From Swiss-Prot:
Principal location listed in the UniProt entry: secreted
Active-site residues, record numbering mapped to chain: H65 (charge relay system), D110 (charge relay system), S204 (charge relay system)
InterPro entries: Peptidase_S1_PA, Peptidase_S1_PA_chymotrypsin, Peptidase_S1A, Trypsin_dom, TRYPSIN_HIS, TRYPSIN_SER
Protein name, per record: Snake venom serine protease HS114
Temperature dependence: Optimum temperature is 50 degrees Celsius.
Keywords on record: Disulfide bond, Fibrinogenolytic toxin, Fibrinolytic toxin, Glycoprotein, Hemostasis impairing toxin, Hydrolase, Protease, Secreted, Serine protease, Signal, Toxin, Zymogen
Signal peptide: 1-18
Record-annotated disulphide pairs: C31-C163, C50-C66, C98-C256, C142-C210, C174-C189, C200-C225
A GO BP annotation: proteolysis
Originating organism: Bothrops jararaca
Keyword presence, Secreted: yes
GO CC annotation terms, alphabetical: extracellular region; secretory granule
Pro-peptide region(s): 19-24
Length: 258
């Protein structure tokens, strides 16, 4: 689930091993139209390439490797072909990255806060998702969702988002699966031991929701997607709560944890 596929050109230059930058949910089913009200679809000139999460009426959180020139965000989307009446489109007014992010490491502190050019309104298909209030426990049931590829090798992007349940695993499982990643990365490890269910190309920036709380952002994984014993890695949102809250409050110079 090497999430680094979303920004393929950029990441290929920096991370020859990163293959899952923008992955889709493999092994899932079509999401209920009302279960992804905070899910944001991100498009550029080539089409859909990443997801994000609506935190409030003005801010979206996604992966920093989802940054692209002239992208747009669509909120309230289910089918990419059929417009919802309450669907809203916004452009980025401001993009904020961790100021202490390592410039030579595209995967370090892989978060991007995007301020919308105008606020969105809550509606039948639009509602923000709060930051987590407590960290998740190993064994927690977690929900993944996105418009990413639904096939593990050949990229097959669906018209509607797919959802699936996976479990939060011990960090040691992912450390063993991905020894190339620095130990200081603040991540969560999630998947199913037998494989077959995973985020995949195009799912980057989307959420990992554990027991109803927004705990992770799709970050990194194996290619092909869904292979055992290589679960997905997700940026650990709660470790960045203070930074996110500070930026939203107006302190755009706030520093992320090391």
């Amino acid at each position: 689930m090497v999430l680094v596929r979303v920004v393929a050109n950029l990441l290929i230059l920096q991370l020859s091993y990163a293959q899952k930058v923008s992955e889709l949910v493999v092994g899932g089913d079509e999401c209920n139209i009302n279960e992804h009200r905070s899910l944001v679809a991100i498009f550029n000139s080539t089409g859909f390439f990443c997801s994000g999460i609506l935190l409030n009426q003005e801010w979206v959180l996604t992966a920093s490797h989802c940054d692209s020139t002239n992208f747009q965000m669509k909120i309230g989307v289910h089918s990419k072909k059929t417009l919802n009446q309450d669907e809203q489109t916004r452009n980025p007014k401001e993009k904020i990255f961790c100021p202490n992010k390592k410039n030579d490491d595209a995967l370090d502190k892989d978060l991007m806060l995007v301020r919308l050019d105008s606020p969105v309104s809550d509606s039948e298909h639009i509602a923000p998702l709060s930051l987590p209030s407590s960290p998740p426990s190993v064994g927690s049931v977690c929900r993944i969702m996105g418009w990413g590829s639904i096939t593990p090798i050949q990229k097959t992007n669906p018209d509607v988002p797919h959802c699936a349940n996976i479990n939060l695993l011990d960090d040691a499982v992912c450390r063993a699966a991905y020894p190339e990643l620095p130990a200081e990365y603040r991540t969560l490890c999630a998947g199913v031991p037998e494989g077959g269910i995973d985020t995949c190309n195009g799912d980057s920036g989307g959420p990992l929701i554990c027991n109803g709380q927004f705990q992770g952002i799709v970050f990194y994984g194996a290619h092909p997607c869904g292979q055992a014993p290589k679960p997905g890695l997700y940026t650990k949102v709660i470790d960045y709560n203070t930074w996110i809250e500070s930026v939203i409050a107006g302190n755009t110079a706030a520093t992320c944890p090391p």
